[in-house]
Swiss-Prot record:
GO cellular component, one term: cytosol
Keyword terms of this UniProt record: Amino-acid biosynthesis, Arginine biosynthesis, Cytoplasm, Lyase
Subcellular location as annotated: Cytoplasm
Source species of the chain: Prochlorococcus marinus subsp. pastoris (strain CCMP1986 / NIES-2087 / MED4)
NCBIfam families documented for this protein: argH
Enzyme class, first EC level, given as a word: lyase
Name recorded for this polypeptide: Argininosuccinate lyase
GO biological process: arginine biosynthetic process via ornithine; L-arginine biosynthetic process
């Protein structure tokens, strides 16, 4: 099949180079967006009298027919077409004849592909936002049921202070909310139309860029034709936001992997979201969070690929930009599947071991800060109180006992301000309840945050 640009050349393209150069194997993903873009362009050419009404309608009807055949599975784009743009144009010409050759008037593949990928990515961002929202709902539901369930809080992966499990899960709601806000900002910059910039310099053909932008639902148009076809910063922004989403998914995945180990036993996997071993019959493997954790590197790699692709490219359009699609397509697929998998895991695949969680916070030194705070409330300087508690911890470790095992007289050998009420202050439920500063893990604060989230998510 001859190329539309082949008249400039005397010789034929090397078959391997032809295959190497082609993008149809992956940019066929954009078929519906390319048709949508072309329909808007045909309408505009009619409005500006570049095409007659009959010509425009004939082109639009042809494009709609191609769309229907694709949806019905009767048209499968592929080789020998070079890319999805030529593929559809060739199909259109075969379908409606010479009129189809007029469709490309006043545009280039450079602004065309930029429009297509923005249309595609805009839809995908909206879909990902829905998946993030559903994940937040799942986290909210578990949090709402576990206000009074305690879990050890960690710093440096060492027991630090007891927390409400709800408070712990709400931290992830905050992270995923920021992810949604970032995507919203990215979407605003994706939602700008490059159509009409042509190859790089605009066109002398009478066009109406605002008309096509409005037809396609764009919020604005690129004001500089070179910029319109020269940058893929919106792809990089999306990939960056996606990398952050995956980092948050990876962190909660890592925690779940730890929680379901025999060493932690804070939770267990249900049969719906676990697999076994081909050799070891006792195994129940956390494949879902492990896969999510593993796929995070894949999305990070796509971000690096896009950054490297763009870094040394002079203005304006270059063939390098063909390499933007596969990373973005795979990023969308990966993010979407991981978000859905995590939501299913939270809804159906994990059960918290409340007894083990409560037992854990009753049998450690995570209430040490409260021991120091007790003395602070007795007007003892904090640094002095800190040192006193450090001595008590050392003493308890030497005896293989906990604070709760000490007699009052033993406490008083370290400081005479210790009284009988010290035991009440060391109770983990009271420890958590007392952390009532704004944004803290205190039960009243957690309830306040749950109410705030209920308004955000459900109203």
């Amino acid at each position: 099949m001859s190329k539309v640009w082949s008249n400039r050349f005397d010789g034929s393209l090397n078959p391997f180079i032809e295959e190497f150069n082609a993008s149809i194997s992956f940019d066929k993903t954009l078929i519906l967006e390319d048709i949508e873009c072309s329909i808007a362009h045909a309408k505009m050419l009619s409005k500006t009298k570049v095409l007659s009404t009959d010509e425009s309608l004939k082109i639009i009807e042809g494009l709609e027919t191609i769309k229907e055949k694709f949806i019905e599975g009767k048209f499968c784009p592929g080789a020998p077409s070079e890319d999805i743009h030529y593929c559809i144009e060739e199909k259109l010409i075969n379908l409606i004849g010479e009129t189809g050759k007029k469709l490309h008037t006043g545009r280039s593949r450079n602004d065309q592909v930029g429009t297509d990928i923005r249309l595609w990515l805009r839809k995908k961002i909206d879909n990902i936002d829905i998946l993030l929202y559903e994940l937040q709902n799942s986290l909210f539901s578990i949090a709402e049921s576990n206000i009074y369930t305690l879990i050890p809080g960690y710093t440096h992966m060492q027991r630090a202070q007891p927390l409400s499990l709800a408070h712990h899960l709400l931290a992830y709601l905050e992270m995923f909310q920021r992810d949604r806000e970032r995507l919203k900002e990215v979407r605003a910059r994706v939602n700008i139309s490059p159509l009409g910039a042509a190859a790089l310099a605009g066109t002398k053909i009478k066009i109406d860029r605002y008309f096509t932008a409005e037809e396609l639902g764009f919020g604005n148009i690129y004001k500089n034709s070179i910029d319109a076809v020269s940058d893929r910063d919106f792809c990089i922004e999306f990939a960056s936001s996606s990398a952050l989403i995956m980092s948050h998914l990876s962190r909660i995945s890592e925690e779940i992997i730890l929680w379901v180990t025999d060493e932690f036993s804070f939770a267990k996997l249900t049969d719906k979201c676990a697999t076994g071993s081909s050799l070891m019959p006792q195994k129940k493997n956390p494949d879902v969070p492990e896969l999510i954790r593993g796929k995070t590197g894949r999305v990070y790699g796509h971000l690096q690929s896009l950054l490297t692709m763009i870094k040394g490219v002079p203005l304006s359009y270059n063939k390098d930009f063909q390499e933007d699609k596969e990373p973005i397509f795979d990023t969308v697929d990966t993010i979407s599947s991981c978000l859905k998998a995590m939501t299913i895991l939270l809804n159906e695949g994990i059960e918290f071991n409340v007894e083990k969680l409560m037992d854990s916070v009753h049998n450690d030194f995570s209430n040490a800060t409260d021991l120091a705070d007790y003395l602070v409330f007795k007007k003892v300087p904090f640094r002095e109180a800190y040192q006193v508690v450090g001595d008590i911890v050392k003493y308890c470790l030497s005896k293989n006992i906990l604070f709760k095992d000490l007699q009052l007289e033993e406490f008083q050998t370290f400081h005479n301000e210790f009284k009988e009420d010290i035991y009440e202050n060391l109770n983990p439920m009271n420890v958590v309840k007392s952390r009532n500063s704004l944004g803290g893990t205190g039960f009243d604060q957690v309830k306040l945050e749950l109410n705030n989230w209920k308004k955000k998510l459900f109203t």
